[in-house]
């Protein structure tokens, strides 16, 4: 119920869309009631509309459960939308380059000036990073 797929509980996996499969994966990760949820670029293969819906779902789940969620992403908007704390890593070797909190209310209003300020701040930090050396 938490991920909104109750009416598809008897469906076969091949009958589900990409977004539905991501919701099933999220439900499976939450089923054993972990203290923390680790997510490595969970939305990268989804279309924009499905991605936005899942952002809303994840925010709702986080607000209801209070679980710690560690999210790895290369998507600035995703970080601004979902994170309470952002940790930017340096290129190889990966080290913490910057860390800051995002103190915006939930659910996040992605049209607000404050949300856009957060995105601009993250982008400015990324642009100021030294370039990663090219592979030999």
Describe the predicted segments one by one.
Residues 37-40:
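Catalytic Walker B motif of ABC-type/P-loop ATPase nucleotide-binding domains
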Residues 11-14, 32:
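Conserved signature/switch motifs of ABC ATPase nucleotide-binding domains
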Residues 26:
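Hydrophobic anchor residue at the start of the ABC signature
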Residues 91-121:
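Conserved beta-strand-loop-alpha-helix hinge in the C-terminal portion
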Residues 67-72:
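Conserved H-loop
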Residues 51-65:
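Helical segment within the ABC ATPase nucleotide-binding domain
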Residues 1-8, 60:
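Conserved ABC ATPase "signature" region
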């Amino acid at each position: 119920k938490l991920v909104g797929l109750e009416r598809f509980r008897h469906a076969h996996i091949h009958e589900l869309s990409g977004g539905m499969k991501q919701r099933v994966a999220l439900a499976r990760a939450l089923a054993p009631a972990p203290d923390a949820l680790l997510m490595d670029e969970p939305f990268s293969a989804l279309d924009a509309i499905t991605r936005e819906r899942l952002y809303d779902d994840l925010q709702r789940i986080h607000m209801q459960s209070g679980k710690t969620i560690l999210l790895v992403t290369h998507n600035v908007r995703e970080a601004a939308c979902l994170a309470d704390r952002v940790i930017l890593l340096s290129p190889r070797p990966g080290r913490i380059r910057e860390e800051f909190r995002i103190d915006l209310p939930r659910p996040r209003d992605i049209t607000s000036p404050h949300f856009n300020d957060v995105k601009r701040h993250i982008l400015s930090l990324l642009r100021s990073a030294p370039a990663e050396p090219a592979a030999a």
